[in-house]
Amino acid sequence: CCSTNCAVCIPCCP
């Protein structure tokens, strides 16, 4: 999910 929608998957990306 992070690869496409980081903002929606937080906290998923650094």
UniProtKB/Swiss-Prot annotation:
Secreted as UniProt keyword: yes
Post-translational modification: Contains 3 disulfide bonds.
Keyword vocabulary terms for this entry: Disulfide bond, Neurotoxin, Secreted, Toxin
Disulfide bonds: 1-13, 2-9, 6-12
Gene Ontology CC annotations of this record: extracellular region
Tissue: Expressed by the venom duct.
Signal peptide: none
Keyword Mitochondrion in record: no
GO molecular function, one term: toxin activity
Main subcellular location: secreted
Compartment(s) of residence: Secreted
Role played: May act as a neurotoxin.
UniProt domain comment: The cysteine framework is III (CC-C-C-CC).
Name recorded for this polypeptide: Conotoxin Fi3c
Organism: Conus figulinus (Fig cone)
